[in-house]
Amino acid sequence: MQTADGSNTVYNAVVGENYHSRNGALQESRHVFVNAGLHYFLDTTRANTVSVLEVGFGTGLNFLLTADYCTAQNITLDYCGIEAYPLSPEMIGQTGYEQYVSRGLWQQFNQQYTQSMLAPTTLNANSQLPTANRQTSTANCQLQIAHCKLLQFDTEKTFDIVYFDAFAAAHQPEMWNEEAIAYTVKFMKPGGIFVTYAITGNLKRMLKALGLTIQKIPGAAGKREMLRGILEVRD
């Protein structure tokens, strides 16, 4: 279905909710995750590498926008998405998101989407650039999609940023309880960033108890506020 900003979302019949806000899939993804998460981290750290854990990979829009920016800025990206109900490759190809990212990235994503659920895969997002441009880019983009529920996910990695993009608590309350939030936070690096479209008193209390400093910032269209948390660095 088309959302208010003209971008598309997909309805998940199992959960009973769309993957993105009806007020605009593209604007929500850019505002909540790319701007408040990725850009904030890069602006404050000046890093040339970044790792992202997304809870709720969904349509892949957050990944695509993140990878497109990192490729353009020559930033190495390690991206892991958790998804219990992965969309089919055919559905991914029908989202229309190719208009928001480079042709090379879109083609690589579609080609590697299924493979990335089996093992981490490297996307050569610069494959459609002229040879001279490709040679000046040293950044790479690694994608892994974990086809499992959150509490079944495991890795030895820790991440710079968490995109917490689970379905709303009204549809998936188990994703917003203390066990799920604590399990997610354990995969964060000290100083790491946690961003989500939701902000509730209970969520703020849980994150504070887990050692995060909470920032309330303006939300995407249709929401007054969103939440950004920063995991405190402890001696």
Describe these PLM feature segments.
Residues 49-58:
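Conserved class I S-adenosyl-L-methionine
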Residues 60-64:
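Glycine-rich SAM-binding Motif I of class I
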Residues 200-235:
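Class I S-adenosyl-L-methionine
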Residues 143-145, 159-166:
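Short SAM/SAH-binding signature in class I
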Residues 177-190:
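A short glycine-rich, Lys/Arg-flanked "PGG" loop and its adjoining helix->strand segment in the class I
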Residues 191-198:
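Conserved beta-strand signature within the Rossmann-like core of class I S-adenosyl-L-methionine
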Residues 93-155:
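S-adenosyl-L-methionine
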